[in-house]
UniProtKB/Swiss-Prot annotation:
Topological type in the membrane: Single-pass type II membrane protein
PANTHER family named among the record's database cross-references: THIOL:DISULFIDE INTERCHANGE PROTEIN DSBE (PTHR42852:SF6)
Taxonomic lineage of the native organism: Bacteria, Bacillati, Bacillota, Bacilli, Bacillales
Protein name: Thiol-disulfide oxidoreductase ResA
Compartment list: Cell membrane
Residue intervals passing through the bilayer: 10-29
Keyword annotations of the record: Cell membrane, Cytochrome c-type biogenesis, Disulfide bond, Membrane, Oxidoreductase, Redox-active center, Signal-anchor, Transmembrane, Transmembrane helix
Pfam short name (any one): AhpC-TSA
Its biological purpose: Thiol-disulfide oxidoreductase which is required in disulfide reduction during c-type cytochrome synthesis. May accept reducing equivalents from CcdA, leading to breakage of disulfide bonds in apocytochrome c; following this reduction heme can be covalently attached.
UniProt family annotation: Belongs to the thioredoxin family. ResA subfamily.
Disulfide bridge positions per record: 73-76
């Protein structure tokens, strides 16, 4: 009887040690990439609505205006036409606008893009992993990424055309 109780306690102790060890390993040894102002922007790979691969690191040498948005978001809806209007001018100057939708259906996003005739790359953050990495709250939230791939500013909330143009000027190479 005492042997069974001792064996049971040893097994419980081993399970607890294993759980603590696993927790420590997860916390200290697995490094999850997070966005930090002044640091290199966390890379991501998505497929845009036209089936083209977008990988952030491919835009080194260009400024990137990274916008997180949703079709249901009224402030997002208001600023999209301004981004669309400014896109050709700043694309010529070496600035890319990338809009990442907050994990909605393809049909909802495609309808929105068609309705506003958006010309810049639009993709869906399936599963919301990129939003988590960038710590996005609320929508819209945008990030200015310079030609060296560093995040230089986070912008929360709706922007006017004039504000957007100032931000695009900041990241023009």
């Amino acid at each position: 009887m005492k042997k069974n109780r001792l064996l049971f306690r040893v097994i419980i102790l081993l399970i607890l040690c294993g759980a603590v060890g696993f927790t420590l390993y997860q916390g200290y040894f697995t490094k999850e990439e997070k966005m930090e102002i002044g640091k290199e922007a966390p890379n991501f790979v998505v497929t845009d609505l036209e089936g083209k691969k977008i990988e952030l690191k491919d835009f080194k040498g260009k400024g990137v205006f990274l916008n997180f948005w949703g079709t249901w978001c009224k402030p997002c809806e208001k600023e999209m036409p301004y981004m669309n209007e400014l896109y050709p001018k700043y694309k010529e100057k070496g600035v890319e606008i990338i809009a990442l939708d907050a994990d909605e259906t393809d049909i909802a996003v495609k309808n929105f893009v068609k309705q506003y005739d958006l010309k810049f790359p639009v993709a869906i953050d399936k599963g919301g992993e990129i939003i988590k990495t960038y710590g996005v709250i609320p929508l819209p939230t945008s990030f200015l990424i310079d030609k060296d791939g560093k995040v230089i500013q986070e912008i929360k909330g709706e922007q006017t055309k004039e504000q957007l143009e100032e931000y695009l000027k900041k990241i023009t190479p």
